[in-house]
A protein has these predicted regions:
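Single conserved hydrophobic/aromatic residue that forms the stacking wall/gate
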Residues: 1-9, 13
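Catalytic-domain carbohydrate-binding cleft regions of carbohydrate-active enzymes
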Residues: 15-37, 46-52, 56-58, 63-241
Length: 241
């Protein structure tokens, strides 16, 4: 990754809605043309590895009508607001892979303390690629660790609905790991509550409760609640508007 203006950079991490671009939102794309000098974006490619990597390809792109459709929707709106409020250029590092679990963004040393996680190659390969533990951390996150950022954005949880009892602690462990890698103290960690989707297991409310509990475990964090933002007819849409 080449250098970009250091005034504001955010890491936008995880999940299929983070990974969802603004393509098709024509009004937003037209508006994005005015952000050329204020917003930069780099997408980390979907990559997996059994061991931590030191390099990853990536190229900063300015926000234009031509490039905006590829920008992560969550990251774009956050960056646009930051640029408007702070009056400085903003860079978004889009390090996302849809549908992954919190364990996918955690290192081996921490995962070895979780009795339900199989870290053998056979065990990992027996798991669906986007649900595998550790491999996204190794290939996508570790190479950019230490790159100057001002905070992390996290929109994830659906794939951990059935493991809600462990979620708060595991999310806290992950954030602690990241902060230790970046060596910038308790840099902000903002995360989004999973939508009130009608999960077949009925565990959605328990996962949201675990996300709320994580606030007490993660210093300098903020949870964006979505429970009151969803229309009744969207209960069967895992990613409502």
């Amino acid at each position: 990754l080449h250098r970009v203006d250091r005034r504001q950079r955010q890491m936008c991490i995880r999940d299929r809605f983070n990974n969802c671009p603004i393509a098709g939102a024509n009004e937003i794309i037209a508006r994005a043309g005015s952000m050329r000098d204020r917003l930069r974006y780099v997408k980390i490619p979907l990559t997996a590895a059994y061991t931590p990597q030191d390099r990853v390809p990536g190229k900063w792109r300015p926000c234009t009508v031509e490039t905006a459709p590829d920008f992560t929707a969550t990251g774009y709106f956050f960056a646009e607001l930051l640029a408007d409020v702070l009056h400085v250029p903003v860079g978004i590092v889009d390090c996302t892979w849809g549908g992954t679990r919190v364990e996918g963004w955690t290192n081996r040393e921490i995962l070895e303390t979780y009795p339900d996680i199989d870290l053998t190659e056979k065990g990992i390969e027996a798991t669906t690629d986007w649900l595998r533990p550790m491999v996204m951390y190794n290939a996508m996150l570790h190479p950019v660790a230490g790159y100057t950022v001002r905070g992390f954005l996290w929109y994830q949880g659906e794939s951990n609905v059935n493991q809600y009892k462990d979620y708060a602690v595991r999310l806290s462990n992950m954030v602690g790991l990241w902060r230790s890698l970046w060596k910038q103290g308790d840099i902000p960690f903002y995360y989004v509550e999973v939508a009130p989707f009608a999960y077949g297991s009925g565990n959605g409310p328990y996962l949201r409760e675990a996300q709320w509990e994580a606030r007490e475990l993660i210093p300098n964090s903020g949870l964006i609640c979505t429970n009151d933002l969803v229309e009744p007819y969207e209960a069967t849409n895992i990613h409502p508007k």
